[in-house]
Amino acid sequence: MDLRLEFFLLVDFAFYGAYYIGALILFILSSQKKKDIFNTWGYKKGIIYGLLISTIGALVMYPVINGAQPGQTEVFYGVLIALFIVGLGFSLQQTGANPFAVSLGDPKSGSSRLNLAGGVNSFGTTIGPLAVAFIIFGTLSGEGTPEFSKMQGLYIGVAALFILCAAVFYFSKSLPDGITNEPFEPANKAMYLLIALTVIMFICFGWVFYTYSIPEPTIEALKEDLEFKRLAALITSLIAVIGSIYYAYVKSSSNSRGWGALQYPQLALGMLAIFTYVGVEVTIQSNLGEVLKLVTDKLNNLNGLGLPALTDTGIAKYISLYWGGLMIGRWTGAISVFNPTEGLKKVLLIIVPYIAFGVIVLVNYGSYTWNEIIIFSVIVAIQIVGFFIAKDNAIATLKIFSVIGLIAMLVGLFTSGDIALFAFISGGLFCSIMWPCIFSLSITGLGKYTSQGSSFLVMMILGGAIIPPIQGKIADIFTIQSSYWVAVLCFAYLILYAYLTQKVLSKQIK
């Protein structure tokens, strides 16, 4: 069995698919009970439940990897189950945390509060790989033999952090419960549509996974034909998602009854935007390692960018820089939360991004050359200009950074060397503030449907399970660098979303 490709497919599907399944189960149960379960719990309690479920997932890891040896397939599937449980908990946390953060103050600054929360998360994803390498291997380089006993301790620590966070929320008296008693209106049409979508996706992915469980064809023509069929199955699941949302968008505009939160066009458009945004954020870095490792010029040992092919150890600093770019943008986007004076805010918009970049360089001390630091510093300056032009306007921010992100991907496609490499890496920087902008715009004006709408948006984190494997298949069939046209198309939709949502919200205000 070819575990390399199946591994990436299953890990993405188990984790990001759990967001979709968790939010879908919550929605179906609410529909059956004829009350919004999350509204009944309240945002605060919902977040606590999510943290506790994720705790269970982290604890499941302990017996799964107890005495495990590298390469054991049964251990791999046990890890997938644990990841799925963690993802289910995250699904509840996201469903509650995002509208909760928006509701804590002026809705206009809701995206800034989401940026603040996201900035903390991004710091974790930046230092996380280094911390894991140090704990498991005893070095920051990630070289050596993994010790599973240390991994057990790591997951116990993660479980303890989840419990600590849950305790903070539970005992905090200053945080509102977020309970609402709005009457529940069934959304049966939306429920049946989502169930049908789920069936289609499971058929598509199930078939793809099955093809990896049987011997690969030895005849080149048959192997190539199978790759195209796998790609077709993955694209079918993508079309099913887009088609379902478009169907709801069209049908609810003529008769809103039975569609629930999906009757609001800003939500339907936002669901596809979240799907696309998460997909592009995950797929850029998921395939970046392969771009840097895959040898295309065997004589000179060069990769597709014309740079020396790297090992897993060599690419770690670039993956850290990619996630660090997300941290830079979110720290900068959160400045408005602290209500600085106009003059101080302008200064902070320049200083904070470089402080965040300094943190990245520090945690990767000695890894980056001066040339790499200068190149990324210039890219950070471009983002700073974007923030000044956007002026905290969510729609303007989306437009600007989606356009810059699209341009960056095109530069990566049509150039080579460090310019192409850093163009792809900059995708993290320009994606960084999109989640809060999309989320706050999508739930604007939903009223009693806010928690249901939030649940629908969380379902669309599914993009992280569908878009990366599509790019991976395109890379297998064509070339890894050309597969980044997938990212170009994602940014193109985000530009379109910004314009369409601006029109929709303008009409509703009038």
Language-model features: where?
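C-terminal ends and interior cores of transmembrane alpha-helices
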Residues: L52-Q72, A356-T369, G386-K391, V403-S416
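Glycine-rich segments within core transmembrane alpha-helices of 12-TM secondary carriers
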Residues: S109-F137, L161-F162, G453-P468
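C-terminal membrane-cytosol helix-exit motif in multi-pass small-molecule transporters
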Residues: V132-S141, I156-E182, Y192-E216, A233-S252, ...
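Extracytoplasmic gate region of multi-pass secondary transporters
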Residues: V199-A233, G260-S320, G324-G329, V361-G366
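Central cavity-lining transmembrane alpha-helices of secondary-active solute carriers
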Residues: L9-D36, M61, S320-T332, G463-I466
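Intracellular juxtamembrane helix-capping segments at the cytosolic ends
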Residues: L92-S109, L288, S432-G447
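Hydrophobic core of transmembrane alpha-helices in multi-pass small-molecule transporters
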Residues: P70-Q93, I374-I379, I419-M434
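Conserved MFS/SLC helix-loop-helix module at the cytosolic interface between two early adjacent transmembrane helices
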Residues: I21-Y77
